[in-house]
From Swiss-Prot:
Keywords: Ribonucleoprotein, Ribosomal protein. One of its GO terms (cellular component) is cytosolic large ribosomal subunit. This is Large ribosomal subunit protein bL17. SUPFAM superfamilies: Prokaryotic ribosomal protein L17 (SSF64263). GO terms for biological process: translation. The gene is rplQ. Part of the 50S ribosomal subunit. Contacts protein L32. It comes from Parvibaculum lavamentivorans (strain DS-1 / DSM 13023 / NCIMB 13966). NCBIfam families: L17. Belongs to the bacterial ribosomal protein bL17 family. InterPro entries: Ribosomal_bL17, Ribosomal_bL17_CS, Ribosomal_bL17_sf. Residues 120-139 are annotated as: Disordered.
Amino acid sequence: MRHGNSGRKLNRTASHRKAMFANMAIALIKHEQIVTTLPKAKELRPYVEKLITLGKRGDLHARRQAYAALPDKVWAAKLFDVLGPRYQERQGGYIRVLKAGFRHGDSAPMAVIEFVDRDESAKGQDSGPVHVEGDEEAA
């Protein structure tokens, strides 16, 4: 019996789940809206909402907890500089999950997970290094 056990396993090991949610949280903080499967979105929501609450607190211990949970320090800093002040007056409910139909390949239910009162300009922001032709010659 699994009384009191919350959370989905999502067919992954504990370390894989931890890394996946950390990376998805970074993507959500960076772009403020991502598309994923519905079960992943439902599991990601409390993970990120707790990080936003840390951003609202803003003290040193909260920063250290956020840096421990997120692998990229640049986007962890956005929690405290942008998102924390934005949601200072809101008592929870920083994220919404919208159903987005089914994926063609395997009919998996898809969802859009986004911040409430999100910044529209953050969507499609730079996603990291891009392969450029000619770099192989220099190496």
